[in-house]
UniProtKB/Swiss-Prot annotation:
Domain comment (free text): The WXXF motifs mediate binding of accessory proteins to the ear-domain of AP-1, GGAs and AP-2 through hydrophobic interactions. Selective binding to the GAE domains of AP-1 or to the alpha-ear domain of AP-2 is tuned by the acidic context surrounding the motif and the properties of the second residue of the motif itself. The WXXF motif 1, which is preceded by an acidic residue and has a glycine in second position mediates specific interaction with AP-1. The WXXF motif 2, which is followed by the C-terminal carboxyl group negative charge, allows specific interaction with AP-2.
Function of the protein: Involved in endocytosis.
Pfam families, A to Z: DUF1681
Record protein name field: Adaptin ear-binding coat-associated protein 1
Chain positions with Phosphothreonine modification: T211
A GO-annotated cellular component: cytosol
Source species of the chain: Homo sapiens (Human)
Amino acid sequence: MATELEYESVLCVKPDVSVYRIPPRASNRGYRASDWKLDQPDWTGRLRITSKGKTAYIKLEDKVSGELFAQAPVEQYPGIAVETVTDSSRYFVIRIQDGTGRSAFIGIGFTDRGDAFDFNVSLQDHFKWVKQESEISKESQEMDARPKLDLGFKEGQTIKLCIGNITNKKGGASKPRTARGGGLSLLPPPPGGKVTIPPPSSSVAISNHVTPPPIPKSNHGGSDADILLDLDSPAPVTTPAPTPVSVSNDLWGDFSTASSSVPNQAPQPSNWVQF
């Protein structure tokens, strides 16, 4: 049934070919085209190469009517069905057969060397394809003969899959994570870098900075507490008067009021030596 489903395909067509009756080969040295009557061909016509399955057919047909003159089945190339001559690349010896099984060897030749090249390549490509198909079929048979790997679950065997962002039975649909801080995220500082804080503006610095009132010193001495206070307190630092700002007039007024309200303490004699 496989033979009935095979179709015939055309591999090559050459409109001009000459057929020669060749003498029998006397030795195993091969055929020579110079032994033929090249100027007097026995038949001229058209050559067509077809394939059906793995077998190629060289058909010699009439140029006008297409009637079949002879046919040469080729099951292997290179082989006995098609041979090249030893003294030219344009001539070949083929084995023709009829329907009864009888066979004969004849010579064929092409006027153009390119036609002879196409004839040779068409047969080579066909049997190269046949070889590849045989290798693929052999590999598939070997694969079928190997024991198949059972990847199915055994009875009672289960697996557990943990996939994120999928509705589960208990908690329902998982909520996507949101960024903290109102959706704004800050990038971390670069490694080894230092973060510097910009200095405040001049107006803010003047309004927020208040110089503490100086503590008056007594040269004649006082109580023990006053002497200790003098040792601990740093020397007064004279600061230049800032540029008057309209915004901070009230603050300076409060400071002057507070400094004037401090009473002067009377110096008291003491046995401590003042440094």
